A protein has these predicted regions:
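C-terminal anion-handling pockets and recognition modules
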Residues: 11-15, 130-185
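Acidic/histidine-rich, metal-coordinating catalytic segments
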Residues: 19, 91-103, 127
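Extended, low-complexity cationic-aromatic segments
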Residues: 1-74, 78, 82, 177-181
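Short, aromatic/basic amphipathic alpha-helical patches
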Residues: 105-113
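A short acidic, often aromatic-flanked loop/helix-cap motif at beta-alpha or helix-coil junctions
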Residues: 23, 122-126, 150
Length: 185
């Protein structure tokens, strides 16, 4: 079915950005204020256990959808899309995403109410959700987690405190607003 034909079948058309990010037990280092010439002190942990957070954000409204997985592959991505599609079944979703190999495998089943727009290769800066990952990791800076369960709890608390206003202020680039206005979305 053509995209134009799909549009008439749904209540509204929504624009989302998607990406995945790895969160783990390795210490997230960020700048600290110190006296000039003094190296900042912090406890470093070099454990390499991690989890993947898959995320979708609607920059205009600040609405978001996150799901945690233990790994990054097309099977997890397909289930993630299905869960998202079931949450908003009456809307047509245009999703901007990067060119990760698992985003376009032959066997990938994309729900009918989702259309992909692939961003140019090697341009994470055009995907607004990258700024949200940075924002989340800034909350985790210099934390040392004993295990993944403690990291999960902290991450869930941070995500639960995110308001739509904050998400929109981080991810709503002016060029996106302009493009959506021109496209009448």
């Amino acid at each position: 079915m053509l995209h134009k034909e799909k549009q008439g079948l749904y209540r509204q058309v929504r624009y989302w950005v998607e990406d995945e990010s790895r969160f783990g037990l390795h210490t997230v280092e960020r700048k600290k204020i110190t006296i000039k010439g003094i190296q900042p002190l912090g406890i470093h942990q070099y454990k390499y256990d991690y989890l993947w957070l898959y995320g979708l954000v609607e920059p205009i409204s600040g609405q978001s959808f996150f799901w945690e997985w233990s790994h990054l592959n097309s099977e997890c991505f397909e289930i993630f899309l299905e869960l998202f599609s079931q949450k908003y079944p009456e809307d047509l979703h245009i999703i901007q995403l990067d060119n990760g190999r698992f985003h376009y495998t032959k066997d990938l089943q994309i729900p009918d109410n989702i259309i992909f727009i692939f961003q140019p290769a090697y341009t994470p800066e055009v995907n607004p959700i990258e700024r949200l990952w940075r924002y989340l990791k800034d909350y985790l800076k210099w934390y040392v987690f004993e295990n993944l369960d403690l990291l999960r709890i902290t991450l869930r608390n941070i995500l639960n405190k995110l308001t739509k206003t904050v998400v929109s202020s981080i991810t709503c680039y002016p060029f996106i607003v302009d493009a959506l206005c021109v496209a009448n979305i």
